[in-house]
Structure formats: structure tokens, C-alpha cells
Amino acid sequence: MSKTTYEEYLKRYGTLIYKNTGTSMLPLLKQGRDAFIVRAVGEYETCKKWDVVLYKRPPESYVLHRVVRVDDNSYDILGDNCIGIERNIAKDAVIGVMTGFIRNGKKYEADSRLYKLYVLFWCKPYRIRILMKKIWLKCSRIWRRKD
């Protein structure tokens, strides 16, 4: 029996609910606790800045990260807990857009006020957050060397 890809699933059902893995979308999504809800992206649809998108990263992995820049043919994408921006992700690599998530059995919509506050205070100042995280990582290495 063959495995169904995310693209095939979204094409067939239109929506995907899936448990995330990894720490790249902390604090929004925590592995083992939360599930995300993604809808298929329309053929000619352009995602917006701050959308969380599911995209295919060659050769065979899928990533759920946030759009931080929209260009004519590509996106720059960053995980909420990451310091490295993935640049020039082709628009056709994006297969879905997060419409919400489920935490402890409760559904949260991506267009809710609470979610928009999270985007305002956590996501929009991403350049400052990246700088602070890099400083923290550098200091941590220095402190470890002293021990």
C-alpha cells in the first residue's frame, strides 16, 4: 500500500489536521500537545505576510513555518522559534495555509483576536527576536567555556 502525500490528501479532502513535530513553531505549536489545521492553497492564490504555510522542502520533507516576506514568485519563511530565514521558497512549493490549531481539545482560529495579538507581539518583531536569540546563544557559549 502506498503512502498518501500531503498534496494528495489536501487535494482530496481540502483540509488536513496533523500533529506537529519539532520545536520550530514554539511557542505557538508544541510537539505532543498541539495539532494544526491546514487548508489547501488555491492554484492562483498568493499567501499573505504572517500566514503560516505548509510547504514541501526537497527532497521529501514538509515544513510548517510563517511567511515573513512575499515577493512576486517566492516567499521568505521563518519558524516562530528559528533564527534562520529560508529565502526564495517558490510559491508552488506551498501546499497549504494554517487556518487554526487545536490545543488541549480546544480549537483556535487563525483569524481570532487572540491569535492576531500573538502575531503582533511575537511574530512581527521577528528581527529583534532573532538578534536577541543570537546574543543569548553567543553568551551561552561563552559562559559554558568558563566552566
Q: Model regions: which residues?
A:
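Extended hydrophobic leader/signal-anchor segments used for secretion and membrane insertion
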Residues: 1-147
